[in-house]
């Protein structure tokens, strides 16, 4: 096997836009900036908004559900 072909695996920081710093290890040599993390993402914070996404059948029933066939 060849010697020293593995990349360097060192410590790095991932800084979120909310100010949270995540310390991790990576082959990437520099610190990175991320947009969202588990501290500020709506799914993890519980502030997620649910949109009422009615489908095509709901729309059809709303338009034509009151009409009765003879």
Curated annotation (Swiss-Prot):
PANTHER family: 50S RIBOSOMAL PROTEIN L31, CHLOROPLASTIC, LARGE RIBOSOMAL SUBUNIT PROTEIN BL31A. Zn(2+) binds at residues 16, 18, 37, 40. SUPFAM superfamilies: L28p-like. The keyword Cell division does not apply. This is Large ribosomal subunit protein bL31. Belongs to the bacterial ribosomal protein bL31 family. Type A subfamily. Keywords: Metal-binding, Ribonucleoprotein, Ribosomal protein, RNA-binding, rRNA-binding, Zinc. InterPro entries: Ribosomal_bL28/bL31-like_sf (IPR034704), Ribosomal_bL31 (IPR002150), Ribosomal_bL31_A (IPR027491), Ribosomal_bL31_sf (IPR042105). It comes from the Bacteria. One of its GO terms (cellular component) is ribosome. Part of the 50S ribosomal subunit. Its cofactor is Zn(2+). The keyword Nucleotidyltransferase does not apply. Binds 1 zinc ion per subunit. One of its GO terms (molecular function) is structural constituent of ribosome. Binds the 23S rRNA. One of its GO terms (biological process) is translation. The gene is rpmE. It holds the Pfam family Ribosomal_L31. Transmembrane segments: none annotated.
């Amino acid at each position: 096997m060849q010697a020293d072909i593995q990349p360097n695996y060192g410590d790095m920081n991932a800084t979120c836009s909310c100010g949270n710093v995540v310390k991790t290890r990576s082959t990437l040599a520099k610190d990175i900036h991320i947009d969202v993390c588990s501290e500020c993402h709506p799914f993890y914070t519980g502030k997620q908004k649910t949109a009422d996404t009615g489908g095509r059948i709901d729309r059809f029933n709303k338009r034509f559900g009151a009409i009765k066939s003879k």
